[in-house]
């Protein structure tokens, strides 16, 4: 299995409000950056959207280390998700995105590593800036 690193971040102005996401995929010395957003969303949804969109790019099963400043995403992947499935996602927020995650993560081995946000982690800072930029693009202005 190829070893891949994924760094992701999500942003929401207002939470909920205009949101953006960004992810960096790294395999050896190759990198791919993706970003996007939605007009009305939350930071947790954008963080998860970043991960799902990154996973969709991968063509074969990989061993993935995910780096995120979202304890919600890291804890869900490492701890909560199996139990959520057993309980049919009862009382779980963002069920649509978690079910999508289960689909796009099939075949992959994923370990999520929490990193402190805004703490000088280069890839996290890049994702944070891109996600904020994507969110700002979706702010509606009144004239």
Swiss-Prot record:
S-S bonds: none
GO BP terms: DNA replication, removal of RNA primer
Domain RNase H type-1, residue spans: 1-136
Cofactor requirement: Mg(2+)
Entry binding sites for Mg(2+) 2: 9, 128
Entries under CDD domains matching the protein: RNase_HI_prokaryote_like
Cofactor binding notes: Binds 1 Mg(2+) ion per subunit. May bind a second metal ion at a regulatory site, or after substrate binding.
Molecular function GO labels: magnesium ion binding; nucleic acid binding; RNA-DNA hybrid ribonuclease activity
PROSITE patterns, sorted: RNASE_H_1 (PS50879)
Residues binding Mg(2+) 1, per UniProt: 9, 47, 69
UniProt xrefs under Pfam families: RNase_H
EC code: 3.1.26.4
A GO cellular-component term linked to this record: cytoplasm
Principal location listed in the UniProt entry: cytoplasm
Alphabetic keyword roster: Cytoplasm, Endonuclease, Hydrolase, Magnesium, Metal-binding, Nuclease
Reaction(s) this enzyme catalyzes, per UniProt: Endonucleolytic cleavage to 5'-phosphomonoester
Family stated for the protein in its record: Belongs to the RNase H family.
Function: Endonuclease that specifically degrades the RNA of RNA-DNA hybrids.
Protein name: Ribonuclease HI
Originating organism: Helicobacter pylori (strain ATCC 700392 / 26695) (Campylobacter pylori)
């Amino acid at each position: 299995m190829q070893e891949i690193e994924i760094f992701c971040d999500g942003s929401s102005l207002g939470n909920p409000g205009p949101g953006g996401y960004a992810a960096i995929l790294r395999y050896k010395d190759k990198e791919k950056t993706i970003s996007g957003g939605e007009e009305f969303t939350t930071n947790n949804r954008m963080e998860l959207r970043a991960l799902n969109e990154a996973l969709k790019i991968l063509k074969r099963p990989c061993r993935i280390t995910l780096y995120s400043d979202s304890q919600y995403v890291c804890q869900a992947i490492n701890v909560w998700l199996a139990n959520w499935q057993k309980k049919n996602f009862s009382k779980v927020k963002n069920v649509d995105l978690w079910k999508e995650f289960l689909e796009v993560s099939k075949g992959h081995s994923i370990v999520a590593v929490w990193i402190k946000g805004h703490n000088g982690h280069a890839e996290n800072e890049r994702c944070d800036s891109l996600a904020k930029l994507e969110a700002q693009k979706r702010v509606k202005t009144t004239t």
